[in-house]
Amino acid sequence: MMTQFWITTPLEKMTPEQWESLCDGCGKCCLNKIIDDETDELYYTNAACHLLDNDTCGCRRYPNRFTYVPECTSITPENIAELTWLPDSCAYRRLHVGKGLPSWHPLLTGNKEAMHAAGISVQGKTVNEMKVKYLEDCIVLWPMLDVE
């Protein structure tokens, strides 16, 4: 079994490999979001980045994603506090606010199947952003789901 480094190592002290392994690969950060102009409320949509694979929930061009999507966000220990749009289920966000990893997290289960079974990932729930005319028509609530 893997050493549970996330319990003993502060986020800012993690190696790049440790940091990257915290990502559960749910794909929620790849969803387009809308901010209401009047209320500043954030809404998730099921319109995903055109690079997201709807089945694996992974980026088709991850190593070179900034070439294809310059506005893609790189989540780092330095900017995690500012990324308030990350869902509550996100391991980076959970650890930043002092929560542990949920029982379905791949670092605890050894694979992504428990995450998919818990309904946490975007698997099978998205549409390619290139096929969407109005993001407002794609607002969904399920990305906010956080299951222990």
UniProtKB/Swiss-Prot annotation:
InterPro entries: Puta_zinc/iron-chelating_dom, UCP006173. NCBIfam families: PRK05170.1-4 (NF003500), PRK05170.1-5 (NF003501), PRK05170.2-5 (NF003507). PANTHER family: UPF0260 PROTEIN YCGN. HAMAP family: UPF0260. Belongs to the UPF0260 family. This is UPF0260 protein Sfri_1740. It comes from Shewanella frigidimarina (strain NCIMB 400).
